[in-house]
Amino acid sequence: MDDFLEHLSKDDNKAWYGAEETERAAKLDAIETLLITDSVLKRNDVKKREKYLDLIENSGNNNGKIFVLSTSKITVSNLTNQQI
């Protein structure tokens, strides 16, 4: 998480935040590590939930590391509320 926040603050194009940006990175097979919150996997909108599951599958198929983060963690709450 610290590496992600560091790259995000440097704006060095090594970290993406948000669904659209992350999907673009996935299309380029540019995801080495995927951090995703458990809340997106619990959405009532089945199409959106399936989209995130596809993103996880794509990242895993390209040897990416996948971490599902609990939204109950304070750092995840801060990240979710961050204005970027």
UniProtKB/Swiss-Prot annotation:
GO biological process entries: nuclear-transcribed mRNA catabolic process, no-go decay; nuclear-transcribed mRNA catabolic process, non-stop decay; RNA surveillance
InterPro entries with a match to the protein in the record: eRF1_3, Ribosomal_eL30-like_sf, Transl-rel_pelota
A Pfam family assignment: eRF1_3
Family: Belongs to the eukaryotic release factor 1 family. Pelota subfamily. Highly divergent.
Name of the molecule in the record: Putative pelota-like protein YCL001W-B
Annotated organism of origin: Saccharomyces cerevisiae (strain ATCC 204508 / S288c) (Baker's yeast)
